[in-house]
Amino acid sequence: MSMPIPSRQLFIDGEWREPIKKNRIPIINPSNEEIIGDIPAGSSEDIEVAVAAARRALKRNKGREWAATSGAHRARYLRAIAAKVTERKDHFVKLETIDSGKPFDEAVLDIDDVATCFEYFAGQAEAMDAKQKAPVTLPMERFKSHVLRQPIGVVGLITPWNYPLLMATWKIAPALAAGCTAVLKPSELASITCLEFGEVCNEVGLPPGVLNIVTGLGPDAGAPLAAHPDVDKVAFTGSSATGSKVMASAAQLVKPVTLELGGKSPIIVFEDVDIDQVVEWTMFGCFWTNGQICSATSRLLVHESIAAEFIDRLVKWTKNIKISDPFEEGCRLGPVISKGQYDKIMKFISTAKSEGATILCGGSRPEHLKKGYFIEPTIISDISTSMQIWREEVFGPVLCVKTFSSEDEALELANDTEYGLASAVFSKDLERCERVSKLLESGAVWVNCSQPCFVHAPWGGIKRSGFGRELGEWGIENYLNIKQVTSDISNEPWGWYKSP
C-alpha cells in the first residue's frame, strides 16, 4: 500500500520548528526497502531549546497553567487527546503499519490502546485530587501533618520503535496526568506517528511547551536529553546497553530514572495442557509484533513427556503463519524494522547453527518475498544453556526450545538469565501455576497465556530488565514527588532553649 507520508518538523513550544542544523533522516518502508519520506534530525541544540520550552511551561504563571492545576483540569486535556486519536484512528493505524512493518490488525489494537491509555490516566489525574493533603497520623498532638503529591518537573522520555506511539503514550499520559512537562525523543526508526501526535496536541489546545517532540539519532538527541541538567527525570525503554548509558548519565546529576529494558523471557509448559491451545499461545508470545517485543517469551521449556508431540504441532502451526506485506488481509508476520535488525537476527541464527543447534523451521527469508526485511518465524532446538541464542535477546521471530523433567528443573532453567521482565507458565493445575508464579524471577507472570498487557496493571522488570513500574496507579507515581507538610498547631512555646 502506498500513501503520502506527512512531512513534519520538530514540535517545540507548540510550534513546528526546523532543526537548527537543518538535517533530515530518511524513512525506509521495511516492507519494500524504499525511502518513503524523512523526519527531522534533531541535535543537542534542539534538545536545549525543547528543554527550555518545557521548563517555561512548568513554571509559567507559577505553574497555574499546568503543573499546579488540579488533576481534573489536566484530565480534560487527556480525554480530548483520547477522543482526537480515536477520531483520526485510521490515519494513525496506516502510518504505524507502513512505518514499523507490524501487521495492520496489530496496529489497530495499538492505536485503540493509545486512546485507552489517555482515558485511563485522565481518571488517575482526577483521583490524585482526592489524595492531595492526605493526613499523616503523628504521635504528638501538637503537630499536624499531610502529604502533597507534586509533579517531579521536566521529564525526558526516550521511547522505542516496536510500539512507536503506544510506548510513547505509556510515558506521556502519566507524566502529563501528574503535571509534568516533557520532551519526547522517539526512535529514529519509527517516528512518524509520534510527530503526528504533535498535531493532536495543538488541536486540543495543550499549552505550549507541555509536550515537545524531538526526533533524531540516539547519540545526537537522546544522549543530550538524558544528560541535560534541567531535566528532572528520564524514562527510557530500549536495550539494556543503552539503558546503562542513560543510567550513567543520570547518575552524574543524581537524577531518577525509570528503565524498561531487554528480556529473554521463559515460557514453561507442563504435561497436563491442551496442546493446540498452548501451541497458539506459545506462537503469540514470541511472534507477535514480528517477534520484536521486549517481553517475548522466546525460551520455551516443555515437559519431556509431551515434548515430541508439542514441538511437532508447534512447527506445523508456525509454518502456517501468513507472512506478507502488513497491509494484506490476514497478515500475521511482517518485516522486522530495519536492515540492521535483519542482519543482526540472521547472525544470531547462523551462530546458533554453527554452535550445533537445529533449525526446526524458518531461519531464512521467505521465498515469496524478495524485498523487505522479512524473516520466517524460526524454531530452534538442540540447545545448550551456554549458547548465545539461549542467553541473549534476539528481538526477532526466533523461539528456542528445551525440555525439562521436573518443576524444579523448569524453574532453574527459567530463572537462569540476567533478565527478568516477564514469564509464562501453562498448566491445568492452578495450585502449581500459583506456586511457580511466586518463584519465577520477573516483573510480570502470565498464567495460561502470554503477552496480554493492560494499562490498569503495573509493568516493569527486575535484574537487567530494568526497574520502576509503568502503567496502573504505579505509572503516575513515577512522575510525582511526595512532600510532607508538618505544622505546629499549638500556641505554646517549644521550650527547648532557655530565654535570655
Curated annotation (Swiss-Prot):
Its annotated pathway? Amine and polyamine biosynthesis; betaine biosynthesis via choline pathway; betaine from betaine aldehyde: step 1/1
| One annotated GO molecular function | betaine-aldehyde dehydrogenase (NAD+) activity
CDD domains from the xrefs?
A: ALDH_F10_BADH
Give the top-level enzyme category. Answer: oxidoreductase
Q: Which SUPFAM superfamilies match?
A: ALDH-like
Q: Indicate the annotated site residue(s) for Transition state stabilizer.
A: 162
Residues of the active site: 260 (proton acceptor), 294 (nucleophile)
Q: Name the keywords, alphabetized.
A: Chloroplast, NAD, Oxidoreductase, Plastid, Transit peptide
GO terms for cellular component? chloroplast
Please list the GO biological process terms of this entry: cellular detoxification of aldehyde; glycine betaine biosynthetic process from choline
- List locations, semicolon-separated: Plastid, Chloroplast
Mainly resides where?
plastid
Q: Report which reactions are catalysed by this protein.
A: betaine aldehyde + NAD(+) + H2O = glycine betaine + NADH + 2 H(+)
A Pfam family matched in the record: Aldedh
Span of the transit peptide along the chain: 1-7
Provide the binding site for NAD(+): 238-243
Family, according to the entry, reads as follows: Belongs to the aldehyde dehydrogenase family.
The protein in question is named Betaine aldehyde dehydrogenase, chloroplastic
